[in-house]
From Swiss-Prot:
Gene designation per UniProt: NFIB
Motif, 9aaTAD: chain positions: 397-405
Species, as recorded: Bos taurus
Protein name: Nuclear factor 1 B-type
Oligomeric form and interacting partners: Binds DNA as a homodimer.
Transcription as UniProt keyword: yes
Functional note: Transcriptional activator of GFAP, essential for proper brain development. Recognizes and binds the palindromic sequence 5'-TTGGCNNNNNGCCAA-3' present in viral and cellular promoters and in the origin of replication of adenovirus type 2. These proteins are individually capable of activating transcription and replication.
Gene Ontology MF term list: DNA binding; DNA-binding transcription factor activity, RNA polymerase II-specific; RNA polymerase II cis-regulatory region sequence-specific DNA binding
Biased composition (Polar residues): 324-340, 407-420
Compartments where located: Nucleus
Keyword list, A-Z: Activator, DNA replication, DNA-binding, Methylation, Nucleus, Phosphoprotein, Transcription, Transcription regulation
Residues found modified as Asymmetric dimethylarginine: 335, 388
Domain notes: The 9aaTAD motif is a transactivation domain present in a large number of yeast and animal transcription factors.
GO cellular component annotations of the record: cerebellar mossy fiber; nucleus
Top-level taxonomy: Eukaryota, Metazoa, Chordata, Craniata, Vertebrata
Biased composition (Pro residues): 359-368
Length: 420
């Protein structure tokens, strides 16, 4: 799936997100935001939204830019990644993408040992159970935050209390739901002029006309459409739902990362913002480079080693070359490994490139750790807004080449040191 890199900053880009984003349903963004708007309106005005106001909010959310929806989904996926136990993250991705038979995926419990509740929006006071979030995200079922009791776990689930595997979660349908489904079906057939509606035996009784009031602003066809459409639909190249390519990183865990990026929009010049959905949000990897299949270390590193390595702090460094640049055989570097350019039909200039290995930065001459004063190193996908290297300076040179050494025995050095 191709999408613009401007919608995913370095803090929101991770192979976990890269693989799961095409499987998020488009209704998730509209549904979570609509519920939050309704709750905020009720707390402010102490009354519920009118039908016209709610319908206007729904239309506004449905017409939102795809880049905004993807940015929201990437943040939520990053949060879910932290809430899933580390040893189950690989199984979660492989089962959701259909590369492995569904198995239990356990989440980190709350302080009481129960399933956690998270807020799905920034600065939102409405919380959702993790299993509810999974059903809405990957199945597109519009559940309320109070519908936790309607969820049932599969008989194959070994830990129903903490399992968040979407394939193990089902929604219980009661008699009232069946009755309403029949009533709505008869109403739709009557409006469409179906011949069966002319049969008096199949017509709903007249007293049912006044027994139900539709409180939602979605109709049936609209719900079905947005629940089946992936959230990545409408950006870059639109793939049919059944032809969405899977992520090669999770197809073969020993083959490294094949990062697919689109060059339709230029890299962002703004400094990427850190995910701040809530206070306990773990920082995403910054400045880390994903191994290439051509790298000797790629085949020997497991999922857990990559996960731990990408969560470790790094120091500020500047790559020798930009990621997307035409390189000649003379200036090839062992750090940079470029995949064969597989051009997509109709999109010229789209290539796949990753940085193969990560070289440790040179030792700093400063007497104190640089991690305490310097922000995390930005990814090579984006330019840094404050640090600039003059053309005559070599980024690999350390600070000792430009800072005069201090010698207490030398009077000139001592005098210049205090006067400077």
């Amino acid at each position: 799936m191709m999408y613009s890199p401007i919608c995913l900053t370095q803090d929101e880009f991770h192979p976990f997100i890269e693989a799961l984003l095409p499987h998020v349903r488009a209704i998730a963004y509209t549904w979570f935001n609509l519920q939050a708007r309704k709750r905020k309106y009720f707390k402010k005005h102490e009354k519920r939204m009118s039908k016209d106001e709610e319908r206007a909010v729904k239309d506004e959310l449905l017409s939102e830019k795809p880049e905004i929806k993807q940015k929201w989904a990437s943040r939520l996926l990053a949060k879910l990644r932290k809430d899933i136990r580390q040893e189950y993250r690989e199984d979660f991705v492989l089962t959701v993408t259909g590369k492995k038979h569904p198995c239990c995926v356990l989440s980190n419990p709350d302080q009481k040992g129960k399933i956690r509740r998270i807020d799905c929006l920034r600065q939102a006071d409405k919380v959702w159970r993790l299993d509810l979030v999974m059903v809405i995200l990957f199945k597109g079922i519009p559940l309320e935050s109070t519908d936790g009791e309607r969820l049932m776990k599969s008989p194959h689930c070994t830990n129903p209390a903490l399992c968040v595997q979407p394939h193990h979660i089902t929604v219980s349908v009661k008699e009232l739901d069946l009755f309403l489904a029949y009533y709505v079906q008869e109403q739709d057939s009557g409006q469409s002029g179906s011949p069966s509606h002319n049969d008096p035996a199949k017509n709903p009784p007249g007293y049912l006309e006044d027994s139900f009031v539709k409180s939602g602003v979605f109709n049936v066809s609209e719900l079905v459409r947005v629940s089946r459409t992936p959230i990545t639909q409408g950006t870059g190249v639109n793939f049919p739902i059944g032809e969405i390519p899977s992520q090669p990183y999770y197809h073969d865990m020993n083959s490294g990362v094949n990062l697919q990026r689109s060059l339709s929009s230029p890299p962002s010049s703004k400094r990427p913002k850190t995910i701040s959905i809530d206070e306990n949000m773990e920082p995403s990897p910054t400045g880390d480079f994903y191994p290439s299949p051509n790298s000797p270390a790629a085949g020997s590193r497991t999922w857990h080693e990559r996960d731990q390595d990408m969560s470790s702090p790094t120091t500020m460094k500047k790559p020798e070359k930009p990621l997307f640049s035409s390189t000649s055989p003379q200036d090839s570097s062992p750090r940079l490994s470029t995949f064969p350019q597989h051009h997509h039909p109709g999109i010229p200039g789209v290539a796949h490139s990753v940085i193969s290995t990560r070289t440790p930065p040179p030792p700093s001459p400063l007497p104190f750790p640089t991690q305490a004063i310097l922000p995390p190193a930005p990814s090579s996908y984006f330019s840094h807004p404050t640090i600039r290297y003059p053309p005559h300076l070599n980024p690999q040179d350390t600070l000792k080449n430009y800072v005069p050494s201090y010698d207490p025995s030398s009077p000139q050095t001592s005098q210049s040191w205090y006067l400077g």
